[in-house]
């Protein structure tokens, strides 16, 4: 970690206001960052390489309306063979620069047919459906903060549809079956994905305020007839629905 920070200190001057972790297909957000420096993960000592399509593996340092940000364009997943602790290495690095908030984003499956695809969801609880430490799904409550209230207010003011609900973590890499989706819904899940939860736990462990925002790119298996879920469709839909996602993050960061 020392070598990593020593390398990054050459490019990061002063404290950071917000850090952002981008989910699959949501990388158009980086176009909003000004005066940016782009560092490739593979050139940063101690960093892992990203392998999943839609995760470029870049750390972007810059500004949004004079607000200092670090943006991780690419994340690491449990199904790639990384432990929660390894996934949390990125959070530990970001925490070193004293961000006020960590915005953890993802593209996820929508489990509520009353919600339109392309709408956004902010997590107010988490369901650990990984069965790594328990033979039952485990509920983790989200501790609300002033930043969450601000985000909800900004969404309302700008007519951005922002639902609140439970994000469900599965290990992947295959998508859930229709029976699994039904069970997740019965446990109160509103969105499902293969990331984010490890980062949330690491933020919680380090007392780093965080908000989890999901772009709902597809409906869960079995909710629509004859629909097959493919990763390329998730990426395409994330790009298709990028405007509200980008606008919400930009407006929120500008308000800091």
Regions found by a protein language model. Give the residues of each.
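Metabolite-binding pocket within alpha/beta catalytic cores that recognizes anionic/polar moieties
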Residues: 1-139
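Generic non-transmembrane alpha-helical segments
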Residues: 7, 11, 150-160, 247-255
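Non-catalytic positions within long, well-ordered alpha-helices that form the structural scaffold/packing
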Residues: 94-98, 185, 204
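Short acidic/polar active-site loop segments enriched in Thr and Asp
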Residues: 100-101, 190, 209
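Active-site/ligand-binding-proximal alpha/beta "capping" segment
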Residues: 153-190, 256
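Zn-dependent metallopeptidase/amidohydrolase metal-coordination segment
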Residues: 194-233
């Amino acid at each position: 970690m020392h070598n990593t920070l020593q390398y990054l200190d050459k490019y990061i001057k002063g404290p950071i206001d917000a850090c952002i972790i981008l989910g699959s297909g949501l990388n158009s957000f980086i176009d909003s960052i000004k005066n940016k420096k782009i560092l490739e993960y593979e050139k940063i000592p101690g960093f892992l390489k990203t392998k999943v399509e839609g995760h470029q593996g870049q750390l972007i340092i810059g500004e949004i309306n004079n607000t200092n940000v670090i943006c991780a364009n690419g994340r690491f997943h449990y199904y790639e063979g990384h432990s929660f602790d390894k996934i949390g290495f990125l959070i530990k690095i970001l925490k070193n620069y004293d961000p006020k908030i960590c915005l953890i984003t993802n593209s996820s499956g929508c489990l509520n047919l009353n919600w339109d695809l392309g709408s956004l969801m902010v997590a107010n609880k988490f369901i650990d459906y990984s069965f790594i430490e328990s033979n039952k799904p485990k509920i983790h409550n989200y501790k609300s903060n002033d930043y969450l209230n601000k985000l909800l207010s900004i969404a309302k003011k700008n007519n951005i549809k922002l639902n609140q609900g439970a994000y469900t973590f599965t290990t992947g890499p295959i998508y859930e079956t229709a029976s699994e989706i039904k069970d997740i819904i019965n446990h109160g899940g509103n969105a499902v994905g293969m990331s984010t939860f490890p980062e949330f736990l690491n933020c919680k462990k380090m007392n780093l305020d965080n908000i989890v925002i999901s772009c709902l790119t597809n409906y869960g298996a079995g909710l629509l007839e004859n629909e097959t879920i493919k990763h390329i469709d998730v990426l395409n839909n994330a790009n298709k629905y990028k405007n509200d996602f980008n606008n919400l993050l930009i407006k929120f960061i500008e308000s800091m």
